Regions:
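Conserved N-terminal catalytic core of the sugar/cofactor nucleotidyltransferase
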Residues: 2-5, 13, 27, 31-102, ...
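Conserved core of the sugar-phosphate nucleotidyltransferase
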Residues: 108-180
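Active-site metal-binding loops of divalent metal-dependent hydrolases
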Residues: 10, 105-106
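Short internal beta-strands
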Residues: 50-54, 125, 284, 300
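Short N-terminal binding/cap micro-motifs at the start of the first secondary-structure element
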Residues: 11-16, 132
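Left-handed beta-helix
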Residues: 180-325
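Conserved beta-strand segments of alpha/beta enzyme cores
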Residues: 24, 72-74, 144, 206-208
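A structural signal for short hydrophobic beta-strand segments in well-ordered beta-sheet cores
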Residues: 25, 137-139, 209
Length: 325
């Protein structure tokens, strides 16, 4: 079995944090996002991985080759962004082999080994309040998918596609995507993976819907921090600090410096960062960043950033009111 991971996204909604790195290279809980995805792939028993790269793809390639060289890796480059179906096609081969497809900017709460143990094709689904923003699966009483629709205006189901797919024979999916492109069948101007899977269903290929506990799309600051909380919760806390108060879960790099501060919960402090006289909760601090005399929550601090304020000495009497901007 092999895996295909689309990771060519620019991450416009995460700017300025994606001006210098691709979205999948943002640091969460002590590891780049693509690293967490590859850990999931390995837990499913995958040994061969195609990572579809684009924007600043050389950074992805360098990181993955450094830390995951034990896997068989290749990095197809998506020159033109023509949709998820087109991206996935770049990583498929003409071999009778199962393929696990995971979106490179998504964190999943699922048993991956159990997911790929299905005896048929499978897609991960999650119940959502507003399915119109997602690909949607309609299913029968046996959880067999009867229809897939990309971002329907009037959804007939509340089961959203979560961005994880297992196809028993990659050649079948490859043929479906190639037909979309040959016939120029687009939805919202792109070749959609959802439409290729629907073609498979229409051609008699069974696909099961597997409801998972949850998934975290890292496309916005808010969803990125949600993913961060989930990852810290499911990993052992790593603390390296003296003279500070730590509220787990946190990740503090062994080469970070934290002094006279309160850290956590849900904080990552990357290599070389220095935190002095600060209170941090729900925050990600990048490599070599400096934070001094600050109270931060729900914050993203980039690599080499400097965030500081001044200490103040005040003398405030009874019934007084002091407001500091």
């Amino acid at each position: 079995m092999r895996a295909v991971i689309p990771a060519a996204g620019i991450g416009k909604r995460l700017r300025p944090h994606t001006l210098n790195v691709p979205k999948v290279m943002i640091n969460l809980a002590g590891k780049r996002l693509i690293g967490h995805v590859l850990d999931a792939v390995e837990s499913a028993g995958v040994e061969s991985v195609s990572i579809i790269v684009g924007y600043k793809g050389e950074q992805v390639e360098e990181y993955v080759n450094r830390y995951y060289s034990h896997l068989r890796l290749d990095f197809p480059y998506q020159v033109e962004r023509k949709g998820l179906g087109h991206a996935v096609l770049e990583g498929l081969e003409d071999k009778e082999e199962g393929v696990l497809i995971l979106l490179g900017d998504t964190v999943f709460d699922v048993d991956f080994k159990q997911f790929v143990a299905n005896k048929s094709n499978a897609i991960a689904v999650v119940k959502v309040e507003d399915p119109r923003r997602f690909g949607v699966a309609e299913i029968d009483g046996d959880h067999r998918v009867t229809k897939l629709v990309e971002k329907p205006e009037n959804p007939k189901s509340d089961l959203a596609l979560a961005g994880m797919y297992y196809i028993q024979d990659q050649r079948v999916l490859k043929a479906s995507i190639e037909k979309l492109i040959a016939d120029d069948l687009k939805t919202r101007g792109e070749y959609q993976l959802t439409d290729a899977l629907q073609l498979m269903i229409e051609n008699g290929e069974p696909i099961d819907a597997v409801e998972i506990n949850g998934w975290y799309d890292c496309g916005t600051k808010e969803s990125l921090l949600d993913s961060h909380r989930f990852l810290l919760k499911h990993h052992l806390s790593t603390e390296h600090s003296k003279g500070s108060i730590i509220h787990p879960p946190v990740f503090i790099h062994s080469e970070a410096k934290v002094s006279n501060s309160v850290i956590g919960p849900n904080v990552t402090i990357d290599k070389g960062a220095e935190i002095v006289d600060a209170i941090l909760t729900e925050t990600i601090v990048g490599k070599d960043a400096q934070i001094c005399n600050m109270i931060l929550t729900n914050s993203l601090i980039g690599d080499h950033a400097v965030v500081e304020s001044q200490k103040r000495v005040v003398n405030v009497g009874d019934y007084s009111e002091l407001k500091l901007n």
